[in-house]
Amino acid sequence: YKSTPAFGFDRLVATLVSNEYELDGVPGFYTKKNNTYGINFNKKTTGILIPICSITDKIEGFQIRLDKAFDDRKYIWFSSSNHFRGTSVGGPAHFIGNPLSKTVYVTEGALKANIAHVLSGKTFIAVPGVSHYKSLESIFTQLKQTGTTDIVEAYDMDKYTNIHVEKACMNMICLANNFGFNVHRLKWNDKYKGIDDWLYSMNNK
């Protein structure tokens, strides 16, 4: 992963432009008053860039894991929707693993999915937030075409104590059922909140 810059934004944009990269319509970039490009980085957005990848391994956007959370948020999108001629990232789901896998796990958060994939070798989809189950529709459509048969719900263990997370789980399960997948629910020792934490503990026994 790469860190976001804390300064040198104009120089970074100038380098991209001089290398003839097209920045129109790219989330995170916008047009400034002097008709040059700007990039939506600032001192509050310092952190780690986490690529959000499609089932074909193309980057569709970035999340930033913030060094210092603000407004109770640890993650934000690299987006420029609130700037002139800026673009929203749209909140896509993240995919990592083999697109031909018969079984695919669904969790929340790209970084968590990446860690779980490395620790288990399994294929994962990550929604950007538990309530964003509709972001799965495109990937589910593609997985159905490539032969996936089973979806495993692997949301955090607070799904058993948080009614909002449980509702989000059920929405995802209903969506997977509508696509004709066999759906399973994964449960582990609840002292480990996320599947990444649980897999890490299992790998270190």
Enumerate the predicted regions with their spans:
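Extended, non-catalytic subsegments within catalytic or DNA/protein-binding/adaptor domains
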Residues: 2-5
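N-terminal structured subdomain of primase-like DNA metabolism proteins
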Residues: 7-8, 21, 154
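TOPRIM fold recognition
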Residues: 101-104, 111-205
